A protein has these predicted regions:
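Aromatic (often tryptophan-rich) hydrophobic motifs at membrane interfaces
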Residues: 53, 205-314
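Short, high-confidence coil segments that cap the C-terminus of an alpha-helix
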Residues: 38, 107-110, 215, 272
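A conserved beta-strand-loop-helix scaffold within acyl/acetyltransferase catalytic domains
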Residues: 2-47, 53-63, 118-137, 146-147, ...
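Conserved acetyl-CoA-binding loop-helix of GNAT-fold acetyltransferases
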Residues: 88-102, 252-265
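Conserved acyl-donor/pantetheine-binding loop and adjacent beta-alpha core of acyl/acetyltransferases
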Residues: 58-77
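A short, internal acetyl-CoA/4′-phosphopantetheine-binding micro-motif in the GNAT/acyltransferase core
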Residues: 73-89, 145-146, 244-253
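Terminal substrate-recognition subdomain of acyl/acetyltransferases
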Residues: 106-107, 114-169, 274, 279-321
Length: 321
């Protein structure tokens, strides 16, 4: 297999493959949100047939080319249409796809490469063997098959307490269609935490991508004032928690959890199978997501940099390089 940029004539085939074998984050309607900085790449078999793909968000800092995931995008792929049937042949086919991806990174040689893989990819030896730093990350996946009462029962005592307190204190959770409300709460939270957020990309997700068929939001209110928000995107199988925020002056320990539980119930009622919390390795955030009862699920990021840069990064980003 080999990886190369897509031609315009490949777009329809790529999107069909992404629909069948990828996630919503591989589809054109998502990739197009990020303009020229997002590059979609095709994965071609030995006969030149397009069988899959991946995406790379290209950035520049201090004149250096950096490849990474796009904002609000959990993974870059790759995805492909499998042909093999034998277990050994399936393994070899998957590794061929990863080898092709590694070939492309090494051939293009960006100064820094930090690409998160699809969580379904658990065999990352092709990258390890070729000198990439393979870093495990974790998300939490919640099976939506149980009834809401069972889902609540499976949460941690702390999370159940949070949700119960929200109800006892008179907080009300509502579906929110005015995504300006979500934006305000999300931006306020990022600013308080002194974290950078790309507002252009945030607005693209909320106001260009989001529609009733692919997303929903819930807010928790006190006396009609929104004090916490939860925004979710989804395909036909999986709901992805993408954005959340809270009002600092009106914060309540149960407000965020109540909005999240409403989103979980809504995803279940919509017939979705899994709720993906898009987890974090930051201890406090990881503990919060864990409390909702999901299954810890690893996914991997592959990192590589020019040697002088990699040596420098070992001092500031030891966990990644």
């Amino acid at each position: 297999m080999n990886v190369r940029p897509l031609e315009s004539a490949d777009r329809a085939t790529y999107d069909e493959l992404a629909l069948r074998h990828g996630t919503l984050f591989n589809r054109w309607d998502w990739l197009d949100l990020f303009g020229d900085r997002m590059q979609a790449l095709g994965l071609f078999d030995e006969g030149g047939t397009l069988v899959g793909g991946l995406s790379i968000f290209q950035d520049r800092r201090l004149g250096l080319r950096i490849w990474r995931r796009a904002p609000f995008t959990p993974s870059c792929g790759p995805f492909f249409a499998p042909k093999a049937q034998n277990p050994v042949a399936i393994l070899e086919e998957r590794r061929a796809a990863l080898d092709a991806m590694a070939d492309h990174v090494e051939r293009e040689a960006p100064a820094i490469c930090m690409l998160p893989l699809d969580r379904r990819i658990q065999d990352v030896l092709p990258f390890f063997w070729r000198g990439f730093k393979v870093v495990p990350n974790y998300t939490y996946l919640l099976d939506l098959a149980p009834a809401p009462e069972e889902l609540l029962k499976n949460m941690s005592p702390e999370r159940r307490k949070n949700i119960g307190k929200a109800g006892r204190d008179g907080l009300v959770v509502r579906a929110e269609t005015d995504l300006r409300v979500v934006r305000e709460l999300v931006l306020g939270t990022f600013r308080r935490q002194e974290k950078f957020v790309d507002e252009t990309c945030l607005d693209a997700v909320l106001f260009r991508y989001a529609r009733p068929s692919n997303s929903f939001a819930f807010v928790t209110c006190r006396d009609e004032m929104p004090i916490a928000a939860c925004f979710v995107v989804h395909d036909g199988q999986t709901a992805y928690y993408l954005l959340g925020g809270y009002h600092a002056a009106e914060r309540h320990h149960g407000a965020g959890a109540a909005a999240m539980f409403a989103a979980i119930r809504h995803a279940r009622d919509a017939g979705l199978k899994t709720f993906d919390f898009e987890g974090s390795v930051i201890p406090a955030i990881e503990r919060y997501f864990r409390g909702f009862g999901g299954q810890a699920t690893p996914y991997f990021t592959i990192n590589k940099a020019w040697l002088p840069i990699e040596i420098a990064l070992k001092f500031s980003k030891r966990n990644f390089f």
